[in-house]
Amino acid sequence: MSTNNCTFKDRCVSILCCKFCKQVLSSRGMKAVLLADTDIDLYSTDIPPTNTVDFIGRCYFTGIHKCKLKDIACLKCGNIVGYHVIVPCSSCLLSCNNGHFWMFHSQAVYGINRLDSTGVNFLLWGNLPETEECTDEEMLEISAEEYIR
């Protein structure tokens, strides 16, 4: 995976929520663009969401790139919210990318920018622990301030 000359450390960390049922899907989201079509906005995360989404349907390949994908659906409402890049193609691996393989459609999720430990500034990817994982209870305890922003 190529991240040379690419930096994502100044991007805000977002809590990703399903637009259909408001379920929190991930606490480690990042705004991104589709490598195959940079006009398409989406969100991505680096850690598989736990107990919030599951695979649905069969694997498929994209038309432009040869990545192997599988759709993911919200476990609460059942709507498709994105996809997982099961096998990225060499073109995507060699391009500037953030290393995230869990993608969320901007039409299906919304992001809430997380605050850092001061509660004043937005949390940035450069300050986020690589192995941070939240339990379901922790994700549900989102402060009112984070919802307002």
Curated annotation (Swiss-Prot):
One cellular component (GO) term of this entry: cytosol
Compartments where located: Cytoplasm; Mitochondrion
Name of the protein this chain belongs to: Protein FAM72A
InterPro entries, alphabetized: YPEH2ZP
Assembly and binders: Interacts with UNG.
Gene name of this polypeptide: Fam72a
Tissue: Expressed at high levels in stomach and also in kidney and, at low levels, in heart (at protein level). In the stomach, highly expressed in foveolar cells, parietal cells and chief cells (at protein level). In kidney, expressed in endothelial cells, mesangial and epithelial cells (parietal and visceral epithelium) around glomerulus (at protein level).
Ranges that cross the membrane: none
Originating organism: Rattus norvegicus
Function: May play a role in the regulation of cellular reactive oxygen species metabolism. May participate in cell growth regulation.
Keyword Lipid metabolism attached: no
Record's keyword terms, sorted: Cytoplasm, Mitochondrion
GO process annotations (BP): positive regulation of apoptotic process
Family: Belongs to the FAM72 family.
